[in-house]
Amino acid sequence: NGFIAIIGCYAQLQSKEISEIEGVDLVIGAKEKFRLAEYINDIYKNNIDKINSCDISKVNFFKEAYSLGKNRTRAFLKVQDGCDYKCSYCTIPMARGVSRSDTIENIILNVHKIAKEGIKEVVITGVNTGDFGKRINSNKNDENNFLQLIHKLDKIETIDRFRISSIEPNLLNDNIIEFVSKSKKFVPHFHIPLQSGSDKILKKMKRRYLTNLFLNRVNTIKKYMPDSCIGVDVIVGFPGESEDEFTKTYNFLSVLDISYLHVFKYSERSNTEALNYPKVIPELIRKKRSNILRQLSLKKRKYFYQSQIGKKLNILFESENKNGFIEGYTENYIKVRDYWNPNKMNTIQKRVLSSIDKMGYCRI
């Protein structure tokens, strides 16, 4: 007697296709997903059809959201939604709509609500987080931009840490980097989408930067914060990515002073420009290149962890017993494991990292 509702990005993009799947009771898109309970009630009363998607251009409001769960030490706070970029491989603008943001005042109110739940760390999230400040029906950003937002958040005493989830390299300017380096609350951890180490491929992807800018961003971060953690997104197997172009990506990533990679195989998406690009890369080659970069990521992470051995760092311990161990993260996103002690749950402790165990965790 279960009721199956499909909501979110996929439902917005492929509502008709999903509705034909046996057992699906309801499909609702981006604008209507926040009325899920209301739609379920109407379905039971036979008042509406099972499909309700919309023209994504009509999604013209910001819906606040943050995560709070049992035994959580971190909360994820959405400050921005949608994207105005037109990357040739991406369906996010079609699924999530235009870039739009919450107000700084409301964000601060939500941070205080989160703090009352005992949360120690807030992760600032968005579809294009660095574009914060964009308002509907406006051709320019609000005077309250991302830099001003993090300045305001840094003054909140009830939260110990703020972490930026991901930020585009062209939006990660020197002012933001320098501010984080001096911040009381924002931790030295950046996750920056690269997607390719080949300028030719970046241009085909219609990204808003080339490798020189990306290298500059990484070097600037390390100049101000030598112990910072830098994660990078990369896509392999994009149409036209020859062996030479992939080698350029590998070599570029090899010399970058970064800490880990998130590697994605390119996958075709309907209604994207890249879907019609020639020189499609076979799936086996995509998989091979993905594995190569995942191995590089393991080496990068191990090297970064080793560079922190002997240093005293602040560890936020998670509130969960994992087979006799407790895990946590340092401010610069090193995963630490220690023997279970309930008194450590949801506490921040300054400890010296002593070694790396066989599972890849740092020990204290």
Predicted regions span which residues?
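Short flexible coil/turn linkers enriched for glycine and charged/polar residues
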Residues: 70-73, 83-85, 186, 196, ...
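A structural micro-motif
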Residues: 2, 25, 159-160, 228, ...
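Proteins enriched for Cys/Gly/acidic motifs involved in redox and nucleic-acid/cofactor modification
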Residues: 1-132, 145, 175, 190, ...
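Contiguous mid-protein beta-loop-alpha structural module that forms a pocket-lining wall or clamp
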Residues: 241, 256-258
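Residue-level signal for inorganic ion chemistry
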Residues: 9, 36, 124, 164, ...
